[in-house]
């Protein structure tokens, strides 16, 4: 992936991993467009930096995605990198509720949103030099946390979708998967200070080191996520599920 001189669109750029990736890629000499639901959070990410731009987008709104894609291509015709980072995580008790609102919202934001935005931008990206799509999945794509079943399922689906996308766009668009471990962000209440989670700056430091490798790995995996990513291969899957469920 070309990590300098690119025009990069990052969804979920108002906080957490999206915010830090946007700032780091901007520091490397890229033009970065961040998208998210709240302009004030996006402006906090920019913080007066040059070559950073903000556009409001709710990835759960199909019509908004289509309009957004047309607008961003018109405003930034050099766009060559898409990072699908936006997402939500909700706890669900499958034995006590029959209201699927959280599940449906999670599927829309975490799975349909990235698929729709990728679909809306693929024709443009194929026409650009050094084009790349980065899909953010999760270590929970490979070993589920029992308390967040739909989140796990959407991230497993994003992993599979990314593999298929890589094959279909081979030679035209570079397809990369970023699978974080548990990181101290605002994804869930209290998570930004939760003991045992990877500090956000440490995660970003290690992640950017991997992005800067040439060639860029098809999967960006910090060391800490390896336990989950390779649990099934290494015969530790059941043990890993039990360990996550106990926490």
Where is each model-derived feature located?
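Active-site helix of classical SDR
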Residues: 118, 154
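Residue(s) in the substrate-gating loop at a strand-loop-helix junction
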Residues: 138
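Conserved glycine-rich Rossmann-like NAD(P)H-binding loop of the short-chain dehydrogenase/reductase
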Residues: 28-44
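Conserved mid-core segment of classical short-chain dehydrogenase/reductases
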Residues: 66, 89-104, 147-150
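The beta1-alpha1 cofactor-binding region of Rossmann-like NAD(H)/NADP(H)-dependent oxidoreductases
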Residues: 56-70, 100
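C-terminal helical subdomain
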Residues: 177-178, 189-235
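Conserved glycine-rich cofactor-binding loop
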Residues: 12-16
């Amino acid at each position: 992936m070309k990590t300098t001189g690119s025009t990069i669109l990052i969804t979920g750029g108002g906080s957490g991993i999206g915010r830090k990736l946007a700032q780091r890629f901007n520091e490397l000499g890229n033009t970065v467009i961040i998208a998210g639901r709240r302009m004030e959070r996006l402006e906090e990410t920019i913080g007066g930096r040059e070559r950073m731009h903000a556009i409001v987008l709710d990835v759960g709104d199909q019509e908004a995605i289509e309009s957004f894609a047309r607008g961003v291509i018109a405003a930034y015709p050099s766009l060559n990198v898409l990072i699908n980072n936006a997402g939500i995580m909700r706890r669900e008790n499958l034995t006590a509720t029959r209201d699927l609102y959280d599940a449906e919202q999670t599927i829309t934001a975490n799975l349909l949103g990235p698929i729709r935005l990728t679909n809306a931008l693929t024709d443009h990206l194929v026409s650009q030099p050094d084009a790349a799509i980065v899909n953010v999945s999760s270590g929970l794509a490979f070993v589920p946390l029992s308390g967040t079943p739909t989140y796990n399922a959407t991230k497993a689906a994003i992993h599979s979708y990314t593999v298929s996308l890589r094959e279909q766009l081979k030679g035209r668009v570079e397809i990369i998967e970023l699978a974080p471990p548990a990181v101290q962000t605002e994804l869930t209440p209290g998570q930004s200070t939760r003991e045992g989670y990877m500090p956000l700056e440490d995660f970003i430091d290690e992640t950017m080191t991997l992005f800067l490798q040439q060639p860029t790995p098809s999967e960006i995996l910090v060391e800490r996520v390896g336990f989950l990513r390779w649990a099934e291969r290494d015969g530790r899957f059941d043990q890993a599920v039990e360990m996550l469920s106990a926490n």
